[in-house]
Swiss-Prot record:
Organism: Neorickettsia sennetsu (strain ATCC VR-367 / Miyayama) (Ehrlichia sennetsu)
Keyword hit for Lipid biosynthesis: yes
Family from the record: Belongs to the PlsX family.
Gene: plsX
Organism phylogeny: Bacteria, Pseudomonadati, Pseudomonadota, Alphaproteobacteria, Rickettsiales
Biological process, per Gene Ontology: fatty acid biosynthetic process; phospholipid biosynthetic process
Name of the protein in its database record: Phosphate acyltransferase
Subunit structure of this chain's protein: Homodimer. Probably interacts with PlsY.
Keyword annotations: Cytoplasm, Lipid biosynthesis, Lipid metabolism, Phospholipid biosynthesis, Phospholipid metabolism, Transferase
Tagged with keyword Secreted: no
Source superkingdom: Bacteria
PANTHER family registered for this protein in UniProt: FATTY ACID/PHOSPHOLIPID SYNTHESIS PROTEIN PLSX, PHOSPHATE ACYLTRANSFERASE
């Protein structure tokens, strides 16, 4: 127990995601190989399926750093929230519950986003004064990093919710990126005040009228402003944010494949590719969504990290890394201290 006590204890929903449980458990192995003796996994899912995966040579070293907790039910990708929360024997439900009971310090799931948000909200509870949780992460820009929320937890948001997201995103930027006075903007189709939905325009006025100094509200931002590094935090509803994220990821993959293909068209291009290999690898790694996997569910009273539903082992390993970093840096407590200033 003392040995486990020195490690970050991570609850894994092994049955959530398109490639569960194989890629989930392989992802845990990948992370453990890269960070030996740093974590202990509590694996929630069908025990027979988990044991089958652990019998693989690729996962053999995981055996000494995990515990299997059987969960006979699974939250499916098309389950409605009302159905998912009733599946109290599911791997997702039991993994989140493990954090509430403080047996684990964080939970990671690649499963149904809406269900994960709802179950986390019910079991972990909301932070004081917060209406809804949001999925938050950082994206690379020309000048560094930008915090983006919401990325899919709430498809439709009122102006009051968007207003709170601004404070939550600012708190995350301060805690995770060390930005002292974040520049916060609302994502919109233009920068003119008369553009946008009613909720966005109302949120604009609420943020303009605030009297605190937690952050600097700079108005609206278009996607080009976001990736150009002109803003530290960008706020949107979950539908818009998720579309922007997935579009950016698909453009990256298109350009990556095109660049790689261009270096193989002739002998000269192959030589150029060899010369530029190190620089290209560095740039591609910075923008690779698989290496940036893992978004925090901010606003709940615990560390809950959502991985992409289609995560492979490398992507899921990075989601685990994101969760471990949140715990190790005590980011949730720092975020809580900052969020408490919301009216």
């Amino acid at each position: 127990m003392d040995q486990v006590g020195r490690k970050v204890v991570v609850a894994l929903d092994t049955m959530g995601g398109d490639r569960a449980p194989d890629e989930i458990l392989l992802g845990a192995s990948v992370y453990l190989r890269q960070n030996p003796s740093s974590v202990f996994f509590r694996l929630f899912g069908n025990s027979s399926s988990i044991e089958r995966c652990l019998s693989s040579k690729a996962n053999v070293h995981l055996l000494e750093s995990c515990e299997i907790i059987h969960a006979g039910d699974v939250v499916m990708s098309d389950d409605k929230l009302s159905s998912a929360v009733r599946k109290k024997g599911s791997s997702m439900y039991k993994a989140v519950q493990d954090v509430r009971e403080k047996a684990s310090q964080c939970v990671v799931s690649a499963g149904n986003t809406g269900a994960f948000m709802g179950i986390s909200k019910i079991l972990l509870g909301m932070l004081e004064n917060i209406y809804r949780p949001a999925i938050v992460t950082t994206l690379p820009t020309k000048k560094g990093e930008v915090v983006v929320l919401d990325l899919g937890a709430n498809l439709d948001c009122s102006s009051d919710v968007l207003y709170q997201f601004a404070f939550m995103g600012s708190a995350f930027a301060k805690a995770a990126l060390g930005v002292k006075n974040p520049r916060v903007a609302l994502l919109n189709v233009g920068v003119e005040e008369n553009k946008g939905t009613d909720a966005v325009k109302e949120a604009f006025h609420l943020l303009n009228e605030r009297t605190d100094e937690d952050f600097t509200f700079i108005g609206y931002a278009e996607p080009s402003d976001v990736l150009g590094g002109e803003v530290d935090v960008v706020v949107s509803d979950g539908f818009t944010g998720n579309v922007m994220l997935k579009t950016a990821e698909s453009i990256f993959r298109l350009l990556r494949d095109d660049i790689v293909g261009a270096t193989r068209t002739s002998l000269l291009s192959r030589l150029a590719g060899l010369v530029l290999a190190k620089s290209l690898k560095k740039s591609i790694s910075r923008f690779n969504p698989d290496l940036r996997n893992g978004a925090m569910l901010i606003g709940v009273n615990g560390v809950a990290v959502k991985a992409h539903g289609g995560s492979d082992s490398v992507a899921f390993a990075n989601a685990i890394g994101a969760a471990v970093k949140l715990v190790a840096n005590n980011l949730n407590s720092k975020i809580i201290d900052s969020i408490c200033t919301i009216d």
